[in-house]
Amino acid sequence: MEVATFGAGCFWGVEAAFREVDGITSARVGYTGGFLDNPNYRDVCSGRTGHAEAVEVTYDPAVVSYDALLDLFWETHNPTTLNRQGPDVGSQYRSVIFFRNSEEEAAARASKEKLQRSGKHSREIVTEITPASQFWEAEDYHQQYFEKRGVTHCRV
């Protein structure tokens, strides 16, 4: 099993999208990319922790590739808006790929460049590509948020 971590705005919808993928054995939401240890939702929403709302997925690379996960990441949000997804504004909602090794970094950069060249977005893609750091699992009420409430997705 492998692990991948993505930030693409509010983590509820991103988690729901990844949970639908064959080969993903688990997905959990949390906070990463900042400097405060063991942050909570209120801390992260203050905008003073450096953390992003993120989804950490565990997946079987024999069933689903990292490149396929990158494709889904791009589909779940607008990567051209800086620190914003829909009505959610703040650095915690930034678009970011957290890589764990040089292969993931290269794949993420190539995927970003390919999407930029595709012309799908008229504006520059502002997604960060940065080394993975400590992932702090979010409070239980955030886990499987949509599933627990019978909601299928959010609107960006």
What is each residue range found by the language model?
Residues M1-V156:
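Flexible coil/turn and secondary-structure edge motifs
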